[in-house]
């Protein structure tokens, strides 16, 4: 059986957590393939809020196996903290021995470099994700499997500190001594060793046994290292194809690809955001949508739906359908805008240029509606809400197959 993919196709924070949690109830295995604890996903179940960063959303399904793949960078401190929320995780959670370790000094490097950039800072979460991926690519990083031999790992990290002493000195970063470091690594080993394994073989076996598998993306397509709004991007591949490299499976193993989008747009940090709205409307969207970052708590920038960007991301990911999230946040607006094209250097364009800094949105307006909260049947949606969805389908050429009308799991429309 093929593995289905959930992927964000805006700038992250699209609401993937709710959809993965809802769908995970019918899957045997849920996998993360990239990112780190810079990517938060929020799930609401029976009025209770769960904020996860590394552990897949399938953890709330007691029957599902959850896999953190080789493409993820894992902070032992953070995953141990997350794991403490749950009981009986052995046999339900597995971490790739090839996933790279995101250690405390990586975050210090990240934060120091951002400070040095001043007003040219990217706006990272400061969690050390970039430095960890940089070490992975330069072949100087450390992997989860090395935690199983903490004495050797300690020596290797101390040698790394020695070789990079000039960098740590310039950035004014102090490093732990041998005793401190070894104690830290021994604690990690004690708490994490039962979960570290060869996850590629685990996923292959599940595929061969026709298990139902869901691949959960983190962040969003517009933050992809290659295809996003570079350099204001993350350090990993956030598109559906990244699921293959991040788990060790081949493209033929991929099934249905669902792109997750908000009914409007948000972005955290710096970088181009064509439809950002600085008026009262943008402020209202942020307040009603409670648009604050799961990881950083930072206020998200808010704006109207960018159909040009979504069309680009849908094609890039090969989306079979879209899941439209937070439609209820637009309740009560008299007019709702949709970006249908851009203006660049005085010309109208219908594609995403490599440099988004100078594009201006071209909008169409749609009449608003009163409320969609709690509606679970497409036919019961207000007429104008249906028109809004149809406009998105028309421009993106992708069917909106799932519609969320409140944070609750049950308040979701599934279209046949």
UniProtKB/Swiss-Prot annotation:
**Residues reported to bind GTP:** 12-18, 40-42, 300, 326-328, 404-406
A biological process (GO) of this protein is:
IMP metabolic process
Q: What is its EC number?
A: 6.3.4.4
- UniProt-annotated binding residues for Mg(2+): 13, 40
> How does the record describe its quaternary structure?
Homodimer.
Q: Which reaction does it catalyse?
A: IMP + L-aspartate + GTP = N(6)-(1,2-dicarboxyethyl)-AMP + GDP + phosphate + 2 H(+)
Q: What's noted on cofactor binding?
A: Binds 1 Mg(2+) ion per subunit.
> What role does this protein play?
Plays an important role in the de novo pathway of purine nucleotide biosynthesis. Catalyzes the first committed step in the biosynthesis of AMP from IMP.
**What organism is this sequence from?**
Aliarcobacter butzleri (strain RM4018)
Q: What is this protein called?
A: Adenylosuccinate synthetase
The family database entries (Gene3D superfamilies) matched by this protein are listed as: Adenylosuccinate Synthetase, subunit A, domain 1, Adenylosuccinate Synthetase, subunit A, domain 2, Adenylosuccinate Synthetase, subunit A, domain 3
* Entry-linked Pfam families: Adenylsucc_synt (PF00709)
Q: Which residues form the active site?
A: 13 (proton acceptor), 41 (proton donor)
User: What metabolic or biological pathway is this protein involved in?
Assistant: Purine metabolism; AMP biosynthesis via de novo pathway; AMP from IMP: step 1/2
Q: List ligand-binding residues for substrate.
A: 294-300
A Gene Ontology cellular-component term? cytoplasm
Can the keyword Magnesium be found in this entry's annotation?
Answer: yes
Q: Does the keyword Membrane apply?
A: no
